[in-house]
Amino acid sequence: MSRKQLALFEPTLVVQALKEAVKKLNPQAQWRNPVMFIVWIGSLLTTCISIAMASGAMPGNALFSAAISGWLWVTVLFANFAEALAEGRSKAQANSLKGVKKTAFARKLREPKYGAAADKVPADQLRKGDIVLVEAGDIIPCDGEVIEGGASVDESAITGESAPVIRESGGDFASVTGGTRILSDWLVIECSVNPGETFLDRMIAMVEGAQRRKTPNEIALTILLIALTIVFLLATATLWPFSAWGGNAVSVTVLVALLVCLIPTTIGGLLSAIGVAGMSRMLGANVIATSGRAVEAAGDVDVLLLDKTGTITLGNRQASEFIPAQGVDEKTLADAAQLASLADETPEGRSIVILAKQRFNLRERDVQSLHATFVPFTAQSRMSGINIDNRMIRKGSVDAIRRHVEANGGHFPTDVDQKVDQVARQGATPLVVVEGSRVLGVIALKDIVKGGIKERFAQLRKMGIKTVMITGDNRLTAAAIAAEAGVDDFLAEATPEAKLALIRQYQAEGRLVAMTGDGTNDAPALAQADVAVAMNSGTQAAKEAGNMVDLDSNPTKLIEVVHIGKQMLMTRGSLTTFSIANDVAKYFAIIPAAFAATYPQLNALNIMRLHSPDSAILSAVIFNALIIVFLIPLALKGVSYKPLTASAMLRRNLWIYGLGGLLVPFIGIKVIDLLLTVCGLV
């Protein structure tokens, strides 16, 4: 579930952004953006020149210099406004989370058990390792792990999802987040962080931090923009002696205007806004990125590791068929399978009971009335079952049942091996049923591949992204599901060590890997992956290992994360192309206007036939300022994204933003020149 999206130009945010834009005019804020800092210096210089001209201290057209100065200040303000608006949208999204931190006091237990004596302490004084008790109606005061109890928890303040979730001690559902509310029962929680280090604190600090860390690509682009600025600064500085030698020296105001129009001010003014907006869009999708670096890495990812259950399939495996062993009738197998599943509350266990009832009208029986003993499933045994009278019935994985049969002096039938392979090749998971040492047959558990997932994988393949399915199933089952879903590769019988080894293998090949995880056993792989999306419902260890947290705990979100990352990179690249391309058109406006008096041959470049040198220069400066504000919506929303190959995407962007960057300034500058002339302003 995504958070409610803010309107692009929310009035409250616009007003606040305008105030922030003015505050950012101070030099300490400006020098962080070298391109706009040059514009700021130019604005200050032309302001001083226009004042000197107005007072008679310098010869020249004071009104023209004042107009140039005014529009240069507007250029700086628009760049500041773009960044402030992007930051304001992120802060507004985080403000809803600030309200979550309501807990004033907590009940700190003197001993780590329910019923122990408790002291009432301020929540902000809780330290890592402290034990607290929370009951129905309480706000959880800190991030932590449940060490005793189980409760229904409302996490809507953080996730936006209204349905409560169960949190209990043990397993992968023991992690709780400070600021969420207990709806029923109680929990004893061990705090896992110190004050100011909670999940909420980190998220709010990230989006409200005064200094956002630049990503590697952003730094590289900034260096390129600085290099271009230095080149154009040196070129402009050499033009004054050339014009003076020609007998008609160009004024400093015109040279400043020329410099500002030559340097890439459009992308320079929008670069920070694009980065902030990328993280904001991620937050809008209910994904918390710990840094802009993580969002950028998502755009460069070329390998996706996707869990089969819940991501590729619906995750609710259902019993679909009873396949008896040779010499066993299907009803006998169904009866034994139902008995073994009577106390099994998993979706798979319930589906076995229901299938036996539907096929053979076998009614459910009460385990207690039968004086039976239920044997629960464990990760070590990998099977479950029931002991009733003198019958010992088990169901489980093929390997587990094989070991069980051989341990009881039996022999695993060859025909059952064949039936297991047949089920696996169909993409189902085989469960073998045994009574004593006699194998009765196989239950086929079928998981449904999500609709449309094959098409999504085909789109990712077009983009050059390899998809790898991760599953605990055997190789035959994994291969069948992988073929049905359309993934490029799969890892069967996956263990945490195998996942980690696979990630390292891809990274050694120079690839960037993304994955999701929710358990403590996923933490090593999450820490190794370039983009690691931890589920909010997962353990604290998983969330700390990842560089993103999905508040919806939806493994499929990884594909959306990659799309948002690629959209941010495309937006930055597209606007850079547009910015550099539209500088070319400005050359045709300013250079003939500034130097035609000295070098008449330059009139040949005046293809726009602008009214006068002053109107040409002023029109170019005005366009240079206005184009920033017109591109703010594109910087904040991102360019339209379509899954294409890298070469097709490059061609598309060059046509739209390269050619568009050449044509738009010609039209815009000409229109502004006509308006200035008609209004008699030049």
Swiss-Prot record:
Q: Where is the active site?
A: D307 (4-aspartylphosphate intermediate)
GO MF, one annotated term: magnesium ion binding
Q: What class of enzyme is it?
A: translocase
Q: Which residues bind Mg(2+)?
A: D518, D522
Q: Where would you find this protein in the cell?
A: Cell inner membrane
Q: SUPFAM superfamilies per the record?
A: Calcium ATPase, transduction domain A (SSF81653), Calcium ATPase, transmembrane domain M (SSF81665), HAD-like (SSF56784), Metal cation-transporting ATPase, ATP-binding domain N (SSF81660)
User: Which parts pass through the membrane?
Assistant: 34-54, 62-82, 219-239, 254-274, 588-608, 616-636, 656-676
Assembly: The system is composed of three essential subunits: KdpA, KdpB and KdpC.
The protein depicted here goes by the name Potassium-transporting ATPase ATP-binding subunit
Species, as recorded = Escherichia coli O139:H28 (strain E24377A / ETEC)
